[in-house]
Amino acid sequence: MLWKNYVLSSSRITRRLHKSPRKSSFSKNFFITGCLLTVGAVSSYLTYRYTSERENKHELSPSYFVKYKISHKRDIDSSHFLLEVTPLFKQKVNIWSLMTAENLWSVEIKQPEVMVVRNYTPLPLKFNPASKEIEILKDGDNADGKLSFYIKKYENGEVARWLHHLPKGHIIEIRGPFIDYEFPHLPNELKRSRDCLYMDNRNERGNNVRENSQFIYQPYDIMMFTAGTGIVTALQLLLTESPFRGTIKLFHTDKNIKQLGPLYPILLRLQASNRVQLKIFETDRQTKQDVLKSIQKSITKPYPYKGLLPFSNVNNKNIMPVLALVCGPESYISSISGRKYDLNQGPVGGLLSKEGWNSDNVYKLS
């Protein structure tokens, strides 16, 4: 089974992708070693945080809240906005180079007036005051610890509505990171370049060929189904330092693409760079039933995950997904993969079940 191991990270349960137990014992040991290295890397990070608490409580940690100030806020429409926060003290650890695409992670933001916290998935972006543009962080740059978020205001969303009304410079409290999903560790793997995100279109194809040929392990592909602000989970994997090495077949549903604001051009650049196969569905133009029918027609059958294999080639055209991740409102998750019960994944249903996917290769994100 793909879902075999559970890891408790603070109050969260994460799952790891791993190969079928039918493989050889050598392969099993190879995978287990990789998992241990991954856990070791994250544990080292958490240990660093815990042991430094008494000396420095300014570094981001899952065990206590750290103060950040709102450094930029931009309305996309009446419901969606971008938020950038800056720590009061520069962060010593580059969270993006530490987590890479081996971990999907989030942080908790506290609403002190009603004493609730809400999880948000950060993106490696920063606001450039000179150009007034949103920029993708480059390798080695953590912008001193800035975190950027794409947020929607809901009527019953206490934290989002509170954040939207706060002025620039207001102090908020954040803790984390909390790992929401953990991919296999790739020992000694080289970083995947992000140069294509900063290059002219005419140079992207050549750059992809060069950097792909340097992989140590054979990349694997995944499918992601997102709706609304759930798009941030896919963008974190695609934009983080040392991003996802395979191809992501991304199905995204929104009322209209305008709700994505400056994130939409980034998605187009990722698509032009063969990082993602993008399919966007707008409910302004199609009914929910028509959207689901269109999605079902494009769902690829699941392929077995074969573990860490030596690199042979990259095929950006014939995607062979070994995993499906689903993130969005409850009704969307239920339609795509069956209902999720808080920390319990629940049985796989919906469109994915009809196309041969099951609990071995589907994971529902909150």
From Swiss-Prot:
Q: Which cofactors does this protein require?
A: FAD
Gene Ontology MF: a single term? oxidoreductase activity
Q: Tell me which residues make up the FAD-binding FR-type domain.
A: 63-184
Q: How is the cofactor bound?
A: Binds 1 FAD per monomer.
Supply the Pfam families for this chain: FAD_binding_6 (PF00970)
- Kindly list the places in or outside the cell where this protein is found, as annotated in its UniProt entry: Mitochondrion inner membrane
Gene Ontology biological-process annotations: mitochondrial membrane organization
One GO CC term of this entry?
mitochondrion
Q: What is its main location?
A: mitochondrion
**Entry EC no(s):** 1.-.-.-
Q: Which Gene3D superfamilies match?
A: Translation factors (2.40.30.10)
Bilayer topology annotation: Peripheral membrane protein
Instruction: Report the enzyme's class at the first EC level.
Output: oxidoreductase
* General remark: Present with 2730 molecules/cell in log phase SD medium.
Keywords of the record, alphabetical order, are: FAD, Flavoprotein, Membrane, Mitochondrion, Mitochondrion inner membrane, NADP, Oxidoreductase, Transit peptide
Q: What is this protein called?
A: Cytochrome c mitochondrial import factor CYC2
Q: Which organism is it from?
A: Saccharomyces cerevisiae (strain ATCC 204508 / S288c) (Baker's yeast)
Where does the transit peptide start and end? 1-50
What CDD domains does the record point to? Answer: cyt_b5_reduct_like
Xref: PANTHER family: CYTOCHROME C MITOCHONDRIAL IMPORT FACTOR CYC2, NADH-CYTOCHROME B5 REDUCTASE
> Function of this protein?
Redox component that participates in c-type cytochrome biogenesis in the mitochondrial intermembrane space. May play a role in the reduction of heme prior to its ligation to apocytochrome c by cytochrome c heme lyase. Has oxidoreductase activity in vitro.
Which Cys-Cys disulfides exist here?
none
